[in-house]
From Swiss-Prot:
The active site is at 188 (nucleophile). SUPFAM superfamilies: DmpA/ArgJ-like (SSF56266). This is Arginine biosynthesis bifunctional protein ArgJ 1, mitochondrial. Belongs to the ArgJ family. The alpha and beta chains are autoproteolytically processed from a single precursor protein within the mitochondrion.
Amino acid sequence: MVINAGAKLSIARLIRPTASYHPAIGGIRYYSAPPESTIPAAKLKYIPTSGTYPQGFLVSGTYVGVKPTNKSTPDLAFLASEIPCAAAAVFTKNKFQAAPVTVSRKMLQRRENAGIRSVIINSGCANAVTGKGGMEDAEKMVAEADRCYHAPKDGKGGSSIVMSTGVIGQRMAGMTKGAGMIHPNMATLLGMIATDAPIAPALLPSLLKNAVDKSFNSISIDGDTSTNDTVAVLANGVAGGKEVTSESSKDHAAFQKVLTEFAIDLAKLVVRDGEGATKFVTIRVTEAPSEIGARKIASTIARSPLVKTALYGKDANWGRILCATGYSQISEPGEPINKVPEIVPEKTSVSFIPSDGSPELKLLVNGEPESVDETRAAEILEHEDLEILINLGGGKEEAVYWTCDFSHEYVTINGDYRT
């Protein structure tokens, strides 16, 4: 059971509500389109009406007035477990970390990842760079969330994770105040994952970190890292069975696999929900000397404005891809990051992989440009999904990133963000 939030919160009622429920979103997951506008079919994801959901969790979303000019969508979400949970979270690497990030990190450390009961999220106000008052507001949100389920006084303080997203530099008004900025190192992205599997608290942090490295830390929309990024996992063990306590156990490996695959699915949905996005693009770097180098190249291409605008314009400008590949390994002018050359131009190949299963369109082979069929290239770029393959021909490692294009709508959304 998951709730993801970008610039605005997307809420799905999966079990039963703990607060008022907004009927307009029943069964539908809303993506980045203004509430008053028609939502494109590609931006709608339907939640199944049947299935197996984790036991012992309550989830709800409601409107509380954080966004006074937009009363048509919820601005507060609440996920609670009926019993105390093991929990873990990964947070933004931005130096200006928001009050909810600081409060939640300290709470998890104080409780040693055990005894957590809920996650409370608001949209409309990031509560970032708000000083001492903002910290007090985040702590009040924790206290109010705890009060909803009569949390016992165990001397360890609050037991709720708090998340906020919205405008930076604005204070929250108690509990009721408070998908751009997406780039690795937990970048604005908020996510909650709930499981009823019995996982020892000490194991959850590494399980989540491993999953996030291959998912949320492998996506980029605009290259900006938010002050508020947080992904949390709660495990209440209600499903029963023997608790997973060993990293070498088969159950640990099985849970890691499922958690990672699930996180990848969620991360891809975040990219598809990119502000103004019209394309979902996979950047795959293969035959690299090192995984670190491959990730660096994929990341650089994924956040290149020239590559992203070319994709929006349906322009098979492979020179921009090659340019981003070439400068990806530069940390200081003229200095390679690694001693082993990651990129040998004479061995590098670039292709478009169509989403319809048709043969790849080779753009560059071993450093030599191909005679590109521009008509076929345009046909490939008409599709929403596209893979860009960069084969370095110099090793066995690979890396994958997911990104989207830059459109006119992206500029409009972010140009009018506060107005």
